[in-house]
């Protein structure tokens, strides 16, 4: 029989390696993502916190700023205090924008895992300036949202139609859940 202590240690070490990267949306009422260049590894969580109501988080291709691509991530319109989390599954660049009104064309853009050369956040912002109104994806997708109020399980309360099936736990909550599951198997 495999030593359960070894399995537990390996499982918890993998979870502990993942991190949560915090991004503030509309900090101080501005049309900003702070930071606007986000470095995240595979299995990290990028966690967006809304500082002011009336924004969203959308993604699209570099060469079509302010427009969604197929299977874009999309938070839906969020209010002050709402949160949206995205689990990073690869290190390809993810170009972000706010699709509300002309927020994108006014510079409300960001990138997860910017390339080391070539397409820059400055070039994306400049191209977005001529894009007019932003376009939202057709549905909430590729993330989980919550009110920021923890449930008894420690995760944000689900508020989007698909949030319950894709809800991501914070590192601490995941460690507690995994530890409890392994102890239950012993």
Swiss-Prot record:
GPI-anchor amidated glycine-type lipidated residues: 153
Segments passing through the bilayer: none
Propeptide: 154-186
Compositional bias annotation for Low complexity: 143-160
GO molecular function, one term: metal ion binding
Cofactor: Cu cation
Cystines in this chain: 66-104
Cell location: Cell membrane; Secreted
Residues of the signal peptide: 1-18
Topology of this chain in the membrane: Lipid-anchor; GPI-anchor
Gene3D superfamilies xrefs: Cupredoxins - blue copper proteins
GO cellular component: extracellular region; plasma membrane; side of membrane
Main subcellular localisation: membrane
UniProt cofactor note: Binds 1 copper ion per subunit.
Region (Disordered): 130-160
Binding site for Cu cation: 55, 98, 103
CDD domains: Cupredoxin
Keywords from the named record: Cell membrane, Copper, Disulfide bond, Electron transport, Glycoprotein, GPI-anchor, Lipoprotein, Membrane, Metal-binding, Secreted, Signal, Transport
Sugar attachment sites: 87, 142
Family: Belongs to the multicopper oxidase family.
Functional description taken from the UniProt entry: Probable electron transfer copper protein that serves as a direct electron donor.
Protein name listed in UniProt: Probable GPI-anchored cupredoxin ARB_05732-1
Lineage, opening ranks: Eukaryota, Fungi, Dikarya, Ascomycota, Pezizomycotina
């Amino acid at each position: 029989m495999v030593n359960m202590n070894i399995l537990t240690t390996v499982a918890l070490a993998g979870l502990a390696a993942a991190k949560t990267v915090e991004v503030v949306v509309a900090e101080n009422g501005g049309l900003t993502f702070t930071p606007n260049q986000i470095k995240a590894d595979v299995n990290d969580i990028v966690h967006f916190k809304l500082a002011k109501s009336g924004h969203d988080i959308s993604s699209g291709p570099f060469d079509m700023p302010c427009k969604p691509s197929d299977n874009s991530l999309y938070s839906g319109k969020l209010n002050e205090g709402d949160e949206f989390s995205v689990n990073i599954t690869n290190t390809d660049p993810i170009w972000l924008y706010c699709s509300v009104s002309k927020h994108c064309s006014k510079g409300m853009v960001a990138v997860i895992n910017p390339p080391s050369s070539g397409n820059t956040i400055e070039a994306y912002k400049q191209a977005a300036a001529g894009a007019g109104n932003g376009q939202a994806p057709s549905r909430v997708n590729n993330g989980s949202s919550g009110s920021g109020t923890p449930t008894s399980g420690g995760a944000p309360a689900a508020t989007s139609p698909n949030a319950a099936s894709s809800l991501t736990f914070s590192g601490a909550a995941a460690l507690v859940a995994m530890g409890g599951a392994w102890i239950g198997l012993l």
